[in-house]
């Protein structure tokens, strides 16, 4: 991907919106971070010309549904001061066009994120974005989560895993938990959330060495859409059989109630 010249559309003028982040996130981007986030918008819009990266193109919708939403989930980890104090080794599973991993990397420059996706084209785009935004502490990798989770160098090596708009929660858990250290945490981004889904997830977590710590419900600031974020913790080593081979987690999800 070449630099947009001119960009697909001008970066959104978001200065008036940053103040709301202090209320919702307990954090505001610095001027260089604002510039990176605005440049991210321009790069995604330019990339959208040649591949289907996102249907969200309105500047305000992009700010809310990609930038704000990506960072809102991190609040489950504690106050922003506490979050920024940790040198996270994180992974964004199913990153797509780079969300939530790129906003998280911009907001947490002390962290080192791996952005994982099975699509070679999307990862090529994300690699170019990381280069143009000078995010040298992040890397983008084209690989399936099931294979990455069985790689001896990657398995059990992450402090934090993020999964947004990837699959059902129990499937995301099978992708995330094997990659975490014991004590590591995963944040699953959901829309609506039901008690039935929670019970399925808990059954899956009992097999994976994980625990559901917290579910937080909130509404988005502009469109007032309902969101839920789930905080998982790895409390025991994940059995070596997980994640199962590619495709099986989606075809045969863990935690299904066999009595039904």
From Swiss-Prot:
Any Pfam family the entry gives: GidB
GO cellular component: cytosol
E.C. designation(s): 2.1.1.-
UniProt subcellular location: Cytoplasm
InterPro entries: rRNA_ssu_MeTfrase_G, SAM-dependent_MTases_sf
Keyword S-adenosyl-L-methionine among UniProt keywords: yes
Major localization listed first in the record, in broad terms: cytoplasm
PANTHER family, A to Z: S-ADENOSYL-L-METHIONINE-DEPENDENT METHYLTRANSFERASES SUPERFAMILY PROTEIN
The name this protein goes by in its record: Ribosomal RNA small subunit methyltransferase G
Gene Ontology MF term list: rRNA (guanine-N7-)-methyltransferase activity
EC primary class: transferase
Record-stated family: Belongs to the methyltransferase superfamily. RNA methyltransferase RsmG family.
Cited function: Specifically methylates the N7 position of a guanine in 16S rRNA.
Residues involved in S-adenosyl-L-methionine binding: 94, 99, 117-119, 145-146, 164
Keywords: Cytoplasm, Methyltransferase, rRNA processing, S-adenosyl-L-methionine, Transferase
Keyword Ribonucleoprotein among record annotations: no
HAMAP family registered for this protein in UniProt: 16SrRNA_methyltr_G
């Amino acid at each position: 991907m070449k630099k947009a010249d001119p960009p697909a559309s001008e970066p959104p003028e978001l200065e008036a919106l940053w103040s709301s982040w202090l209320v919702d996130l307990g954090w505001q981007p610095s001027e260089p971070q604002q510039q990176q986030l605005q440049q991210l918008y321009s790069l995604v819009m330019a990339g959208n010309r040649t591949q289907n990266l996102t249907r969200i193109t309105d500047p305000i919708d992009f700010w809310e549904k990609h930038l704000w939403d990506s960072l809102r989930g991190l609040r489950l980890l504690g106050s922003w001061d506490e979050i920024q104090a940790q040198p996270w080794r994180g992974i964004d599973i199913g990153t797509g066009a780079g969300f939530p991993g790129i906003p998280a990397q911009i907001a947490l420059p002390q962290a080192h994120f791996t952005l994982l996706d099975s699509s070679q084209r999307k990862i090529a785009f994300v690699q170019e974005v990381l280069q143009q935004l000078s995010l040298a502490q992040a890397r983008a990798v084209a690989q399936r989560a099931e294979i990455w989770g069985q790689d001896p160098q990657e398995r059990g090596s992450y402090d934090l895993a993020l999964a947004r708009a990837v699959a059902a929660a129990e499937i995301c858990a099978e992708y995330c938990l094997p990659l975490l250290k014991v004590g590591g945490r995963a944040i699953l981004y959901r829309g609506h959330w039901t008690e039935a889904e929670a019970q399925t997830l808990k059954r899956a977590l009992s097999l994976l060495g994980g625990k559901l710590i917290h579910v937080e419900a909130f509404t988005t600031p502009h469109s007032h859409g309902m969101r839920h974020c789930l905080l998982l913790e790895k409390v025991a080593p994940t059995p070596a059989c997980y994640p199962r081979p590619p495709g099986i987690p989606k075809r045969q999800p863990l935690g299904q109630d066999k009595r039904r």
